[in-house]
Amino acid sequence: MKTLGTYFQNSETEPLKYGEVNLINPPRQRLRGEEKLTGIEAFPVFNGFCGTDFELMKMGRAGNLNAKFPEGEKRLINGHESVVWVPSENRFAIVLIRGGDSCDPTRYTEDETYFEYGCDGADGLFCDKNYFNPQMLLHLPEKYEGLKKLPLSLAKKLVFSDPYACAVFQHERMEDIGMAQNFRVEKAKRKCSDAEAMEYARESTFDRVVIFGLGTTGLFIGDQIRRNHENAKILFVGRSSEETAKVKFAKEVVKADYLCTDSMSEAETAENIIKKIGGRSTVFVGVSGTNVEHRVAFEHKVLGCNGIYNSFSLGPKITFDTMPFGFENHVIFASINFTQAHMEKAIEILSESRFDEIVELIDKEEFIADPIYAYENKIYSKAAPLKTAVVWNKNYMEMEK
């Protein structure tokens, strides 16, 4: 069986290519203990571009993709953010990306293995059709069951199901760690029971939140914190002007403040952050992908006592002085993943959100004519929108809605 799509390969000149691809359909399992199931056919309808795709393309250019290919293959169909049509079930679905011989793909441990459609060991969604484990084709909210055409506004919202699920998990982890980290402080301060102290700590963990970097990841983490902690003080930090559309949107939707650091030194950045939030941060989320974030948090002391540093960036190396790190009781953690429950929650939230407002489209014909050029000059350029997506199969789309 063949399909048309874009795929990664190890090639200095063509790490990403559009063309005919042989489809494979090995049995896959969703979770440890479950039966491996042969995939059922699905047609990708609306696809989103993710920074992971761009990084995989760079790996292909450097010849480093062998570990990512499906077994026995020398290419990987890319894409892991999509709304698909499942003809055998006559419905739209969101593909749960992560599965495998794992009790919980979020708590991946050494004795477990997992795959990710479009990223690691399993072909993805930038193709005319593919096969997916039927247990991993998640339903849209009940009010949308029975749709035969996908409204454009809904498609734009649901294309964020993967990254927003990450944000749901990020909030959950910060809350878990924050309660464990801070309940004894609250207990000593308030002379209350352990259970009461836990609830106080659940909120005080998010008293002063710094989100260093304003892309979709930072935006969604901020949104999750605001939805769960109405009194949290949230500050986005970035280099974009406060007058840009994305900054205005983030401030309005998340009810957050913003600091533009374009002309500031690191020391000035730290000073202004502390001034803006009224003290040192209780949570510092690094999502800028730069080394500046950890220096601002640790060297310049933006992260306060008992503070949590959430590293969501891929690439930077975190360094810190062990003396203040130890005496100020800091915690550093990183957890870039999610489970089915997180994605199902994300789908429900997104369907009623305004996040369709930050998605812009690239024409499919323009993209497939030269996908590398599109990635480098349209989708991930400095002038790129917060999110780019493509209508992959217009036959299942309602473009007027």
Segments predicted by a language model, with ranges:
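C-terminal hydrophobic helical "lid"/dimerization subdomain
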Residues: 38, 178, 264, 268-272, ...
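NAD(P)H dinucleotide-binding glycine-rich loop of Rossmann-like/cofactor-binding domains
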Residues: 80, 99-208
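Short N-terminal strand-loop motif that marks the start
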Residues: 1-78, 186, 190, 201, ...
